[in-house]
Amino acid sequence: MGFVKVVKNKQYFKRYQVKFKRRREGKTDYYARKRLVVQDKNKYNTPKYRLIVRLSNKDVTCQVAYSRIEGDHIVCAAYSHELPRYGVKVGLTNYAAAYSTGLLLARRLLQRLGLDTLYTGTTDVTGDEYNVEPVDNGPGAFRCYLDVGLARTTTGRRVFGAMKGAVDGGLNVPHSIKRFPGYDAESKKFNAEVHRAHIFGLHVAEYMRSLEQDDEDSFKRQFSKYIKLGVTADAIEAIYKKAHEAIRADPSHKKKELKKDSVKQKRWNKRKLTLAERKNRIKQKKASFIKRLQAQAEA
């Protein structure tokens, strides 16, 4: 059969069905979403939880959510911009920061559910494979599935760093070691030391040292924030170790305090008057009008 040209007449447009809005905008992969959202029919009203990881230029977002007809419900969330509270003040979008954000999400969620003492995860971070074991005579481990959105799932991606942090924090996320840094596809072998180096930011420290020796100007430009805050290559591992301990000690969310002496915002339009102010304004207008009438009568 040869090529048949589509005739875009009245009948064509009457029957035309547009794709979903988020598909048209290129924001949602509905092929993947369907498989992440649809629950087994024998589990009835049990939600299917997703570990959502999204990366931006300045932040790493980790959320646990489940789907309903009216929309997704967020159970818990953690962001890399919270890490300065735990001692990590720079490099909030690298692999180590993604791991820390995933760890923060896991500990925060389990604390809310009252499972933080039963499922502590692993405190010995070796970079090797770890899976949460369910406890006997108790509630099972919290199970969720990784949702990477439109991100490419290549080996060494930061989304898998966030997932590893969540798993080490005590969540049950089905995964394999094939996408972690240190896995060689040709030899099919996994080097856990390479993965551990990424978790503690040692790859950043190594690059800092090499760049400082090769090109000092580039080093000062690329690592200006590190230099400003006095973060050296030798101190990076200790910073992340302390951050992991601090996250486990207190993963709860802290509300941002408003600054007392903050700058007063400019207002470009008039503020609406209250009822009392409107009544007072009318009263003044009446008094002024009566006074003017009296002055005219006397004249």
From Swiss-Prot:
Disulfide bonds: none annotated. GO terms for molecular function: 5S rRNA binding; structural constituent of ribosome. Gene3D superfamilies: 3.30.420.100. It comes from the Eukaryota. InterPro entries: Rbsml_uL18_euk, Ribosomal_uL18_C_euk. GO terms for biological process: ribosomal large subunit assembly; translation. SUPFAM superfamilies: Translational machinery components (SSF53137). The keyword Nucleus applies. It holds the Pfam family Ribosomal_L18_c. Signal peptide: none annotated. Keywords: Cytoplasm, Nucleus, Ribonucleoprotein, Ribosomal protein, RNA-binding, rRNA-binding. It is found in: Cytoplasm; Nucleus. One of its GO terms (cellular component) is nucleus. Its main location: cytoplasm. Component of the large ribosomal subunit (LSU). Component of the ribosome, a large ribonucleoprotein complex responsible for the synthesis of proteins in the cell. The small ribosomal subunit (SSU) binds messenger RNAs (mRNAs) and translates the encoded message by selecting cognate aminoacyl-transfer RNA (tRNA) molecules. The large subunit (LSU) contains the ribosomal catalytic site termed the peptidyl transferase center (PTC), which catalyzes the formation of peptide bonds, thereby polymerizing the amino acids delivered by tRNAs into a polypeptide chain. Belongs to the universal ribosomal protein uL18 family. This is Large ribosomal subunit protein uL18. It comes from Bombyx mori (Silk moth).
